[in-house]
Amino acid sequence: MKFNIDHYIASVLQWILNIALIILSIVLSIFLINETITFIQYIFSTKEYTSYKLVESIIVYFLYFEFIALIIKYFKSNYHFPLRYFIYIGITALIRLIIVSHEEPMETLLYAGAILILVIALYISNMRDLRKE
């Protein structure tokens, strides 16, 4: 009887997680559309925007895109989040942080070091996947 209860609890929690991820993907899609509109407004606006605003908008767009791709990959790979997608998101988020907040040189250097560590982790992760094949 215990096995059936464990299986039932796992199934219910899996359904709750799936529904939450579907809702999250809808919200992220709305934000992605909003960011697309903002990006188009930056391009065709007569106002002068700094290049930082435009680049920040592009990177935020890619963050939304990567999160949506992560959710899609979750459903396609039998309810599993691949590690490399989280690393991609981390690298993109740190690049955005460097672009937006680059006043303090030491912080920028630390962010760049964190990006280097993430790239090394991505390389190690990809090498492990290649060895499995």
Swiss-Prot record:
Keywords for the protein's UniProt record, in alphabetical order: Cell membrane, Membrane, Transmembrane, Transmembrane helix
Membrane topology, from the record: Multi-pass membrane protein
GO annotation (BP), single: cellular response to phosphate starvation
Compartments, record wording: Cell membrane
Protein name per its UniProtKB record: Protein PsiE homolog
Family, per entry: Belongs to the PsiE family.
InterPro entries per the UniProt record, alphabetical: P_starv_induced_PsiE, P_starv_induced_PsiE-like
GO terms for cellular component: plasma membrane
Pfam family of the protein (one): PsiE
Organism per entry: Bacillus cereus (strain ATCC 10987 / NRS 248)
Transmembrane residue ranges: 13-33, 55-75, 81-101, 105-125
